């Protein structure tokens, strides 16, 4: 794979009704209903809204045979009114349901974690090699008849692995690792290959963007080693709602799309399903617009490991680089110095003059030719000011340069000035590739100067900025190249929105935490409580608990598994009933929905993690995710 130049991975074509996937086809957009699948009228109406918004596939939960059989009625309801969208059945726990669904849906999604293996209980299981082989044979014996039904009905299959629902068998042998997730998928793919069943799509998802990106990269590598080219379905599970859901999805999905991986995407938002479609479309269009871009002549650093990257080794300069958290730079050249009360930048670029009033705890950056060494200020140079940089005695300097200006003279200057922090600029259509090329070239040259990525936009809506900036920063963060972020926007957005987006990107990439994190699913027909209003109530009660991770899950499919990545969890347990978790341990079951948020707060308080709300505008508590 070329790290610096965009092209899509070549994949096999899969027929899904009249909307083929993979191969020469465009990246497809899809969503999932959250209405009860036995409610034909509600499902048809919601599916139409998804299609009208631009969705190309509609998935429905089929938790039982009755739901699977009702897909026929939903199909009739759609087709009789001119909606020919392929339907995808989502199956967990019961392979018999998959057999039935394959007769009515254009595609069936099965979950390797619970297709034959029992549901996850977090028990450590011991197998001899012979016993483990026998378990694999059980999968084959059950899976092959299902594939035969799919062949007879021209039904495609998605093998959909979720981080939150790996089986105890896989967990016991491989641990909670990307390798385990990949093997969970490959066990089923090998059977498909043996049976010459090729209408297969794969997904490996997690709410943890780092795990999701690393696992998909590894899966593609393993498939290539075994001669497979199945298309990929991308998504970040439980991404959440609003700003958080958009940034997290853009970061994870965008990082993979930027590397040419992915044939269909679903942006999982805890909102109405049709609201996911415009976000997904913007993300796909932004990435694919860089096709046939001018070539970037980059050189990969010799010690870089794409499948398991570590943070690039840099020399710390004050609080930038080394083991420090990535910093946030912000622009205030328009003279408006307001800051977000929760997300105050570490450095503010003021340009030609300091503001009359400065923000406590904030450092300021001035153009080098007007910098006079004022307290808490630092000079900024461009690549044409190397002589001025040589005569400057500041212990921290910022050098703004694009990759194509990284000449021998600039490299030589950086070797003489380890106190210089490089601010990488790019106006290239593939700015991810050019930023990568600069960071790799510094490493090739033996330089350990920290790198901050300057991203220039002209957006008028927060959503557009969140999608584009998230997609641009994803690969750079997951590659371990990011020592800081600088978002510059010439649209109508306030500085507060831009700053919040920058901090949100660092949190979504798990390299700097500055607020409460929510792991919330989008809901489906299994969800038996009002997910959106519940999320709003939980956020209202806990949004000030910075650094805490709270899971809000509609059902038990991924709920308990995702709790391993959360501090506390709120999981649907039945109609109007909720279970509460402390990490992956269920603390209290079957709480009435109307009491559950209050009980959650009591649980957080009992464990000493609750703080009363204050009106303080102090900087947020921060910690690094390990």
Swiss-Prot record:
Binds 1 [4Fe-4S] cluster. It comes from the Bacteria. [4Fe-4S] cluster binds at residues 521, 524, 555, 562. The keyword Iron applies. Its cofactor is [4Fe-4S] cluster. Keywords: 4Fe-4S, Iron, Iron-sulfur, Isoprene biosynthesis, Metal-binding, Oxidoreductase. It catalyses: (2E)-4-hydroxy-3-methylbut-2-enyl diphosphate + oxidized [flavodoxin] + H2O + 2 H(+) = 2-C-methyl-D-erythritol 2,4-cyclic diphosphate + reduced [flavodoxin]. Its EC number is 1.17.7.3. Belongs to the IspG family. Converts 2C-methyl-D-erythritol 2,4-cyclodiphosphate (ME-2,4cPP) into 1-hydroxy-2-methyl-2-(E)-butenyl 4-diphosphate. This is 4-hydroxy-3-methylbut-2-en-1-yl diphosphate synthase (flavodoxin). The gene is ispG.
